[in-house]
Amino acid sequence: MPKFKRVHLVVMDSVGIGAAPDSDKFFNAGVADTESDTLGHISEKAGLEVPNMTKIGLGNIPRDTALATVPAESHPTGYVTKLEEVSLGKDTMTGHWEIMGLNITEPFDTFWDGFPEEILTKIEEFSGRKIIREANKPYSGTAVIDDFGPRQMETGELIVYTSADPVLQIAAHEDIIPLDELYRICEYARSITLERPALLGRIIARPYVGEPGNFSRTANRHDYAVSPFEATVLNKLADAGVPTYSVGKISDIFNGSGITNDMGHTKSNMHGVDVLIDTLKLSDFEEGFSFTNLVDFDAVYGHRRNIEGYRDCLQEFDARIPEIIDNMREDDLLLITADHGNDPSYAGTDHTREYVPLLAYSKAFKGSGVLPVGHFADISATVAENFGVDTAMIGESFLSQLV
């Protein structure tokens, strides 16, 4: 009999809480991540009022300097700590895979200056189409079709671009490059990006329609991902008959591996919370694990170095926490964490190598307090012990400390 019949893990994408011990090995625009501090700098520079996370104990997490506007609670309602990443990357896929128990010793590649000519030339030779070189860089998916869609409609060239994550995306107007052709090109791109010089997590077909000034992406997106290289705790749960529910891009991150119920993509953080709450309300969700990613912190505000927007986004999520808790059962466990940092006050536009917060809450808790500093994979080890399945590669359970 599990201690908690249902466990709900929410990843606040990129919400770091201070530079990690190995942050000197990770860089942004040539600047080491050693001074990065996503929550600390937002609190210091923009003011951060998150009363619900504060109540659980966010301000109690050990730091060299306290969060400027997030006080410590004398009687927190939950257990808190910070977690360190051991894997060699600071991207979304690496963070999530480690949270589920894997140690990634060969990180995926990200391309802040665009993909190498070797890759572009191979795609051109396979497809018989030229690639628009000016689009070959990290780009907003809507901006890239606004900027280069008209040219594609005239020339039939491919729009190949990337993001902060290890992905290659190909945007194609459905009237110019038919879907079956786009998918075939993406399948080829997948085949040449399984090893260096471009070891990528996903290839994404991004079809769109419309006229210049009024383009829109269609539902015909297709992801060509890679599955985790070893079984994660998601797989262990699914194999043992424990239901797993994914909300947001979780299913994409794991290529569907170990997911028994995909609740679908989400349009925003608030939509993600809505879907999570709908999941909590499911009458047949009697026992199991839900896994939610809220990406706006990272995609909309972190990479764009928008401190005030990031603050507002955190405060919007915090305001929904009582609603999440109201829909939890007495024997549910809520875990809130992150997958890496993305300090909106820092140099460059990339993720930052940071500790991440961990907040644990249950209506069943009799106690509260600060847990020892741990590692990302401790989350999956705790989930595994709770449901009586094996852990994955790494992780130490803190289940016995949740009382």
From Swiss-Prot:
Disulfide bond positions: none
NCBIfam families recorded: deoB, PRK05362.1
Highest taxon listed in the record's lineage: Bacteria
Protein name per its UniProtKB record: Phosphopentomutase
InterPro entries on file: Alkaline_phosphatase_core_sf (IPR017850), DeoB (IPR010045), Metalloenzyme (IPR006124), Phosphopentomutase_DeoB_cap_sf (IPR024052)
Pathway: Carbohydrate degradation; 2-deoxy-D-ribose 1-phosphate degradation; D-glyceraldehyde 3-phosphate and acetaldehyde from 2-deoxy-alpha-D-ribose 1-phosphate: step 1/2
Catalytic activity, as annotated: 2-deoxy-alpha-D-ribose 1-phosphate = 2-deoxy-D-ribose 5-phosphate; alpha-D-ribose 1-phosphate = D-ribose 5-phosphate
GO molecular function: magnesium ion binding; manganese ion binding; phosphopentomutase activity
Family statement drawn from the similarity comment of this UniProt entry: Belongs to the phosphopentomutase family.
GO process annotations (BP): 2-deoxyribose 1-phosphate catabolic process; 5-phosphoribose 1-diphosphate biosynthetic process; metabolic compound salvage; nucleotide metabolic process
Gene3D superfamilies (alphabetical): Alkaline Phosphatase, subunit A (3.40.720.10), Phosphopentomutase (3.30.70.1250)
Protein's cellular compartments: Cytoplasm
